[in-house]
């Protein structure tokens, strides 16, 4: 696969539009670009001998949210990619990429419904919303919503956000993904605690 060409196509279709009203321009592209890398990192940790999966995983990661805004975006994304990449991939590669995109939102970790590649993409996708990116998402969301003070971020993290954290962790397929998730959440909570303290005019 020619990933320079594929990245240019991804930029053309995602970098210069908004997929959510409360997200920054190009958020879908930047998310997909990160997932295209992290899904391969995750594969190396879990299946170090399976490098032959990487091109398909990387391509699916790069385009998995191209359907955002046309819901269900997993289905619309697979349809769009089948047309967009028909001259870029072999028919076998295209079929595999589209199956991965179609499956990426169907998280059922306690079943054998999905194969290893599908589970890898699901986990890489979910993990990208946490850690440093989680703090970025929180701050941009509150800014777009017109919230007025920093204290609302820690109020969420130490309140209703706890249940959301638990639910998202339960969606992960692999134990190592849960370990990565836990580390990311600890970072977010440490930042939220500092925001809570400094938001009241105090010091650590």
What are these regions (language model features)?
Residues 1-18:
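Short alpha-helical hairpin
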Residues 5-8, 34, 96, 160:
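Generic alpha-helical secondary structure signal
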Residues 20-49, 63, 89, 110-204:
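Divalent metal-dependent phosphate-bond-processing catalytic cores, especially two-metal-ion Mg2+/Mn2+ enzymes
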Residues 25, 67-71, 87:
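Short gly/ser-rich anion-binding loops that grip negatively charged ligand groups
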Residues 35-38, 73-87:
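An active-site-proximal "capping" alpha-helix that borders the catalytic cofactor pocket
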Residues 52-73, 77, 97-106:
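His-Asp-centered metal-binding catalytic motifs of divalent-metal-dependent phosphohydrolases/nucleases
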Residues 85-86, 105-108:
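Short secondary-structure capping micro-motifs at structural edges
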Residues 90-98:
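Membrane-interface starts of transmembrane alpha-helices
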């Amino acid at each position: 696969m020619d990933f320079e060409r594929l990245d240019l196509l991804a930029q053309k279709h995602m970098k210069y539009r908004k997929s959510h009203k409360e997200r920054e321009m190009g958020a879908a592209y930047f998310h997909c670009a990160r997932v295209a890398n992290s899904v391969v990192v995750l594969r190396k940790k879990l299946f170090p001998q399976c490098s032959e999966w990487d091109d398909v995983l990387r391509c699916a990661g790069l385009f998995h949210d191209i359907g955002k805004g046309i819901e269900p975006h997993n289905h619309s994304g697979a349809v769009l990619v089948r047309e967009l990449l028909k001259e870029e991939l072999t028919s076998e590669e295209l079929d595999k990429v589209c199956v991965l995109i179609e499956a990426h939102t169907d998280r059922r970790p306690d079943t054998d419904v999905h194969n290893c590649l599908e589970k890898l993409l699901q986990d890489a996708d979910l993990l990208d919303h946490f850690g440093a990116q989680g703090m970025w998402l929180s701050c941009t969301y509150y800014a777009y919503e017109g919230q007025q003070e920093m204290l609302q971020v820690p109020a969420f993290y130490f309140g209703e956000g706890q249940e959301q954290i638990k639910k998202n962790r339960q969606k992960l397929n692999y134990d190592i993904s849960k370990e990565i998730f836990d580390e990311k959440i600890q970072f977010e909570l440490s930042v939220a605690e500092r925001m809570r303290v400094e938001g009241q005019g105090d010091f650590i």
